[in-house]
Amino acid sequence: MSSNMPASLANGRYQLGQLVGRGGMAEVRVALDTRLGRTVAIKIMRADLANDKIFLSRFRREAHSVAQMNNPNIVNIYDSGEETVMTDSGGTERLPYLVMEFVKGQTLRDVIKANGPLSQRDAEQVMLGVLNALEYSHHMGIV
């Protein structure tokens, strides 16, 4: 990720907060949407991948696809954009981002780490949510 991560995106609309997750393609930060006064999650693509047309296309396709969905088991996408930041060497980097619903809570990994294996009933509830989202995604032509 850029060593020059801005404090905000979209001309100050989204004030970036703490890092909440990192994956192979992007990192996710909690942020404040100053226009609507709500907490959001912002997925920011790794700067080194933003110039790769395949990764950038995949990132944009994800935003468009998920924005069309309306399911309680799939996070909502509110906005997307791209920021240009200065690098330490004086160049610029592109930072494409997605603004998403912030879902407060723990990851399944953290729950299992803290409490041990799920009971059969809890595992079934988790799987029902996942399967519901998968079925809906399939119905929408995503998978």
What are these regions (language model features)?
Residues G21, R61, M69-N73:
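Flexible N-lobe loop architecture of eukaryotic-like protein kinase catalytic domains
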Residues S80-G81:
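Activation-segment/catalytic-loop signature of the eukaryotic protein kinase fold
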Residues V130-I142:
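Protein kinase catalytic-loop region centered on the HRD/HxD motif
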Residues L16-G23, V28:
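Protein kinase glycine-rich loop
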Residues V30-T39:
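Conserved N-lobe loop of protein kinases adjacent to the ATP-binding glycine-rich P-loop
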Residues V126-M127:
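Activation segment signature within eukaryotic-like protein kinase domains
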Residues M86-T107, V111:
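Conserved short submotifs of the Hanks-type protein kinase catalytic core
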Residues R46-Q68:
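AlphaC helix of the eukaryotic protein kinase fold
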